[in-house]
Regions:
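GHKL (Bergerat-fold) ATPase N-terminal catalytic module, capturing the glycine-rich phosphate-binding loop
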Residues: 1-188, 195, 406, 620-648
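GHKL/Bergerat-fold ATPase module in large chromosome/replication-associated machines
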Residues: 112, 133-153, 174-179, 184-648
Length: 648
């Protein structure tokens, strides 16, 4: 005896606890018990074909599931191989020992579904008593009846032989599961679980099996293959109508045997753009109803059904093991989606237009994840803009060869400015828009103007041909700017727009991250990076007031100021009110003064412009009008930023 062997002990098993865990807690839903028992019935037919090929010729194969609501019971009957009494003891009544697994190892058959010897135990998750009446094809004259309450103890007694070999499993349901004894509910559940099983599955007295739907990748359709695929997708899709459908075929290198159908769904939800919906069948039986992780993360609009013999299930048979076959299938699905979108664009242009219109936002992100998709989508996918959805090419043409994109949210100064210029701007705050357009501009060798960035603003607001004299700049700053606003003389289009208020994005960010609650909302690492980025600004300048030196209105205002015209202050007050109103209309703009006071200021200006002329000293009149119209208690420093009061 080797060292330490004398201390070996045998592990004890608490059968009651084990049965309770496996029967009650292994599966996520009691409906899985029905799947497991129908799966066992399917494997019984496969076993019969393997063990008795001559006797199986011409033999009708069927599985029938019936419900008795009054008794609260469900019965699953098959015409398969049946069981002998020794087989009942060795396999049916032994946890973890499956005849199916042994037979697969011996024959190498890929038709058998079972693997763990746990499926029958699931019956006790829904039933307080299970009865199995069976006749084996090996002993067609003998019958046996297995009966158990709870799964820990059982009896096997002789029973009349069944009219033909096969098995009848009867479940006397627990009170909390008696609602399962409803044949309409069984049709719905089994119609999804068993749709790909090759053995017909009937419910009640129905002559039509629940899995009688033609499977387009198995049966060559007589008519249009695409129409057959669309019919299957429409029948199987749970939430959305299919826009197009395309096949999944086995990999040429043999890395995956998966076949099936994928489709583009016509729909989305408000809660998420990720509506991936993939059902995976293992040897014809539903294994994973929500296998979305097999699909690429960018394909939130894809639904599908696939089946494989190579995938490995978990013990609960409700998920897949992440092995080499799983990884190969993920790659194959990505290829199938990309190829399917190409084929749709080429062969079904009407469907392609619907896909672009319905899923343009998601496709922008998809294009960034795959070079082939970017090539396909670059000139077709719609981009959200201030003038509705436009392609990148249309944006470029409308922008005289440049693509304009706003970094702020919609409704800001950028939209107002470019609406006046009749140039559309892309909404860079929308998902994937900015990186998509950056890549488009790079590949198409065109300019991209990012409004709200320093470089974009420099391109938009050009230096004036001649700088304004200091006294004129100071007067304009005092008349037009609020505290925290810096007056910046510039030239920009259209010339009919005299001024525009542009928020300082860095100052806005600095204010947000220095908020007392920022530490609670933002992860510390990201917060440190953001604070390092905004350290270069002190936050005192919250917006820049760009004054259009090409504007005739500005020319007239400055001429009136130079000539001491009494209407200069009135005109300045009117422009100041216009600035406040335009800034208020920009949803992301800064607070630019009191909107109510601005509206009242327009009325004051109109009254002043229409009042009878009264001779006044020009200098006195100008000072009085500014104080009265603008309510100034402060003036601006020499740099154009509003500061403490000083003599003008």
């Amino acid at each position: 005896m080797s060292e330490g062997q004398e201390n070996l002990r045998t592990t004890e098993v608490d059968l009651g606890g084990l049965v309770s865990v496996l029967a009650t807690h292994l599966y996520s839903t009691p409906l899985v018990a029905l799947r497991e028992l129908v799966q066992n019935a399917h494997d019984s037919h496969t076993r019969r074909r393997l063990e008795d090929p001559d006797g199986s010729t011409g033999r009708p194969e069927l599985i029938r599931v019936t419900a008795d609501p009054a008794r609260g019971s469900i019965a699953i009957e098959d015409t398969g191989a049946g069981l002998t009494e020794p087989e009942i003891h060795a396999y049916l009544a032994t946890v973890g020992t499956g005849y199916t697994r042994m037979l697969r190892e011996v024959t190498g058959s890929q038709e058998l579904i079972g693997a763990f010897g746990l499926g029958f135990l699931s019956a006790f998750s829904v039933a307080e008593e299970v009865t199995v009446t069976t006749t084996s094809h090996r002993e067609p004259g003998l019958g046996h009846r297995y009966r158990s309450r709870g799964g820990q103890q059982y009896t096997v007694d002789p029973a009349p032989a069944r009219p033909r070999p096969g098995t009848l499993v009867e479940l006397l349901l627990k009170p909390e599961h008696r609602q399962l004894a409803d044949e309409q509910a069984l049709r719905e559940v089994l119609g999804r679980y068993c749709v790909l099983l090759p053995v017909p599955v009937h419910v009640g007295a129905d002559e039509q099996p629940v899995n009688g739907v033609p499977v387009p990748w198995r049966d060559r359709p007589a008519g249009d293959p695409h129409a057959a695929r669309m019919a299957f997708a429409a029948a199987f899709g749970r939430r959305f109508e299919p826009l197009t459908a395309f096949p999944l075929e086995p990999a040429a290198d043999g890395s995956t045997d998966a076949v099936g159908l994928l489709w583009v769904q016509d729909g989305g939800s408000y809660g998420s753009t990720d509506n991936r919906d993939l059902a995976v069948y293992l040897r014809g039986m539903l294994l994973a109803e929500d296998a979305r992780d097999l699909l690429p993360s960018w394909a939130g609009f894809i639904g599908g059904v696939i089946e494989s013999n190579l995938l490995t299930p978990t013990a609960s048979r409700e998920d897949l093991q992440r092995d080499e076959h799983y990884r190969a299938l993920r790659q194959a699905l990505t290829e199938a989606v990309v190829n399917g979108l190409y084929e749709t664009a080429r062969l079904h242009p009407a469907a392609w237009r619907r896909i672009l219109a319905r899923h343009g936002q998601e496709l922008l992100g998809a294009a960034l994840c795959d070079d082939r998709l970017f090539t396909l989508l670059a000139d077709d996918v719609p981009v959200p803009t201030s003038q509705g959805d436009l392609t990148a090419g249309a944006l470029r043409a409308a922008g005289s060869g440049a693509v304009h994109v706003a970094l702020g949210s919609g409704g800001g100064f950028e939209e107002m400015l470019y609406r006046a210029m009749r140039v559309p701007i892309a909404r860079g705050d929308r998902y994937a828009v900015l990186p998509f357009l950056r890549r488009y501009a790079q590949l198409r060798d065109c300019r991209i103007v990012e409004l709200g960035s320093e470089s974009g603003n420099k391109e938009l607001f050009r230096e004036p041909e001649q700088p304004l004299p200091a006294d004129q700049a100071g007067w304009l700053a005092a008349a037009l700017a609020e505290p925290g606003e810096r007056l910046v003389p510039a030239r920009f289009e259209p010339v009919g727009l005299p001024l525009v208020l542009v928020p300082d994005r860095e100052a806005e960010l600095k204010a947000r991250i220095e908020d007392d609650q920022a530490d609670a909302r933002i992860p510390s690492a990201a917060l440190r990076l953001a604070r390092a980025f905004t350290a270069r600004t002190d936050g005192t300048v919250k917006a820049r007031l760009y004054l259009n030196t090409d504007s005739p209105a500005v020319h007239d205002l400055l001429r009136a100021y130079r000539e001491g015209h009494t209407g200069a202050a009135t005109a300045a007050g009117l422009l100041r009110s216009v600035k406040v109103i335009m800034a208020a209309a920009a949803s992301d703009g800064p607070a630019a003064g009191d909107l109510g006071a601005a509206l009242a200021g327009i009325g004051t200006a109109v009254a002043a412009l229409t009042a009878p002329a009264v001779p006044v000293d020009p200098a006195d009149g100008l000072s009085v009008d500014l104080d009265r119209l603008l309510g100034l208690g402060e003036s601006n420093g020499p740099d154009g930023t509003r500061g403490e009061n000083e003599e003008r």
